[in-house]
Design a protein with these regions (language model features):
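Hydrophobic beta-strand residues in large extracellular and virion-surface proteins
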Residues: 9-11, 39-41, 59-61, 73, ...
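A broad, structure-centric signal for solvent-exposed, well-ordered loop/edge residues
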Residues: 18-20, 25, 31-33, 48, ...
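Surface-exposed cap/loop segments at beta↔alpha junctions
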Residues: 44-131
Length: 200
C-alpha cells in the first residue's frame, strides 16, 4: 500500500518484513495510552508465516524509511482458502505493557518519579521492552507521590509526572518521554490518502 506521496508502509516482525497491506490503522494520541494498531492484507499467492512471527513478538512499523511505531503484537490471525491467503496483525502501543503491570509491593508508599522509572522500568522486567527514558526537565523529579501496590505501573508513572507538572508519552522508537509533548514546534504535513492502486 502506498499513499498519495508514493510512500509505503512496512511492518517488521520477528525476522520478516511485510509490505503490500490493504488496510492500516494506527491510532496515536498523547493523552490516550495503549492506542490500537491493526494491519490486514489479502493475497492470492500468499504463504504461511514462519515460526518467528507470533503473538508477543516485537514489531516496528515504518512509513517509508521512518519508524512510526514500536510495539508488541497482541494477536496474529491467518486464514487460507481456495481464493487466497489473509493476514491480520494487531496490538497496542508499548503503554499497554505498563498498563498490564501492577506496581510491585515495596517498603514505603512514597516514591519519586525518577526512582520509579529506575526501579520498575529501566532495571525491571520491562527493560527489554521500553528502549529508554527521556526527561525534559529533571529538576522536578524530586517530588514524591503516594503509590498503591495494586495500581498499574502506567497510572503510577502518569500520576507522578502530573505532580511534577509533566506528561508521559511514548516515542515511535519505543522510548518513554516525560515533559511537555508540545514544547517543540511541529509542522503539519500534507494530508495523506492511502490508496490502492495509485491510479485509482
Amino acid at each position: 500500500m502506498r499513499d498519495n506521496s508514493n510512500n509505503e508502509i512496512r511492518l517488521v516482525i520477528g525476522d520478516v518484513e511485510i509490505s503490500g497491506w490493504d488496510n492500516v490503522t494506527a491510532d496515536s494520541q498523547v493523552d490516550t495510552p495503549a492506542d490500537n494498531w491493526n494491519l490486514t492484507l489479502f493475497r492470492q499467492d500468499g504463504q504461511p508465516l514462519p515460526d518467528s512471527v507470533h503473538g508477543a513478538a516485537k514489531i516496528q512499523l515504518f512509513y517509508n524509511n521512518e519508524v512510526i511505531l514500536t510495539s508488541i503484537a497482541d494477536q496474529i490471525d491467518e486464514a487460507v482458502s481456495r481464493d487466497g491467503y489473509g493476514l491480520q496483525i494487531s496490538g497496542r502501543d508499548l503503554a499497554g505493557q505498563l498498563i498490564d503491570c501492577s506496581v510491585p509491593i515495596f517498603n514505603g508508599r512514597q516514591i519519586t518519579l525518577e526512582e520509579m522509572l529506575q526501579r520498575y522500568v529501566l532495571a525491571g522486567d520491562l527493560a527489554s521492552v521500553i528502549r529508554d527514558v527521556h526527561i525534559q526537565d529533571n529538576s522536578w523529579l524530586k517530588n514524591k507521590v503516594s503509590v498503591e501496590p495494586s495500581e498499574s505501573l502506567w497510572d503510577a508513572i502518569a500520576k507522578a509526572a502530573q505532580v511534577t507538572g509533566q506528561h508521559v508519552w511514548l516515542e515511535p522508537d519505543g522510548s518513554l518521554s516525560i515533559g511537555d509533548p508540545f514544547a517543540n514546534p511541529y509542522q503539519v504535513q500534507e494530508t495523506l490518502r492511502l490508496i490502492r492502486p495509485l491510479d485509482n
